[in-house]
Swiss-Prot record:
Name by which UniProt lists this protein: Large ribosomal subunit protein uL18
GO biological process, one term: translation
An annotated Gene Ontology molecular function: structural constituent of ribosome
Subunit: Part of the 50S ribosomal subunit; part of the 5S rRNA/L5/L18/L25 subcomplex. Contacts the 5S and 23S rRNAs.
Homology family: Belongs to the universal ribosomal protein uL18 family.
InterPro entries: Ribosomal_uL18_bac-type, Ribosomal_uL18_bac/euk
Classification lineage: Bacteria, Bacillati, Actinomycetota, Actinomycetes, Acidothermales
GO cellular component terms, A-Z: cytosolic large ribosomal subunit
UniProt function note: This is one of the proteins that bind and probably mediate the attachment of the 5S RNA into the large ribosomal subunit, where it forms part of the central protuberance.
Length: 128
């Protein structure tokens, strides 16, 4: 499936197209299993969204985002919110019985908010 979708992404030099190509390239190698699901990160200009996905069944096991009502009142910059989202996803993963995950940065650089999510998840007790 990722190979089919990667053909739709043009060979243009836009940042989004380049990120999508990186994401498809990585997704060929990374897949979530029931024992070790995939922690997927999506980043927008203002918010971050995180899901834990079992790719064998195609189910989302847990999710968290900075868009949730409880995060709206959280004081801090976007990186601090991303760290808190990482801690939230770790709490929800533990409640679902998940201790280890495969980190899928979705073509984003491991820097800033993406790294803060990973650090927050580790602080929450999730093994990446």
């Amino acid at each position: 499936m990722p190979q089919l979708l990667s053909r739709r992404v043009g060979r243009g030099s836009t940042r989004t197209a380049a990120r999508m190509r990186r994401h498809f390239r990585v997704r060929k190698k990374i897949s979530g299993t029931p024992e070790r699901p995939r922690l997927v990160v999506h980043r927008s200009a203002r918010h971050v969204f995180v899901q834990i996905v079992d790719d064998t069944r195609g189910h989302t096991l847990a999710s968290a985002s900075s868009f949730e009502p409880e995060m709206r009142s959280f004081a801090g910059d976007k990186t601090a919110k991303a760290r808190r989202v990482g801690q939230l996803i770790a709490e929800r993963a533990k409640a679902a019985g998940i201790t280890t995950v495969v980190f899928d940065r979705a073509g984003y650089r491991y820097h800033g908010r993406v790294a803060a999510i990973a650090d927050g998840a580790r602080e929450g007790g999730l093994v990446l």
